[in-house]
Amino acid sequence: MNFIVSSASLLKQLSLIQGVLNSSNTLPILDNFLFEIKGTELKVSASDLETTMSSKLSVESKEDGLIAIPAKMLIEILKNLSDHPIKFAVNKENFQIEISSDYGKYKLSGHSGEEFPKVPEIEQSSSLKLNSNIISRAINKSLFAAGNDELRPVMSGVFCELNSDNLTFVATDAHKLVRYRRLDAKSENSTSFIFPSKPLN
């Protein structure tokens, strides 16, 4: 499995999802990013079993494949590279990874992508498109009030409610309570859910 990708683009996408990674995982495979190639699209994922985040970017590739790559080591390598194409060569037999650039080669030991936890399918899902600035502002205005008590998971996140006439974000740690409402964001289908705090930070 070989592919070529922009080092800066890859670092940007990995930086977006690395917040999900834990410093002490019960499953060693969770210390890795999952790389999944289909056609010319690379999907990178990170998970802590509770939250999984994924991002996609374009690559040059002639074959599909799946590999788990050590997250910390890969981030450090990419931070030391200037923006130019880098080549990943993956041995499917022993999961050895060679990253080549104009400045040298790096060798890593990866893992089978099949070991990475599968993301459960969402039944009866519905989707909604919102302006990213609206979501970002709503999170910034409410997240600081969320608690961090793992024994009370309902309070360690941000409650989001979408209605036909507004969007409401609520967060509390039992001492302070914040409600942020937007009248310029609407949803045809009313729904509510709790965003875990960790991936929002």
Give residue ranges: language-model regions.
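Structural preference for solvent-exposed beta-strand-turn elements
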Residues: 1-201
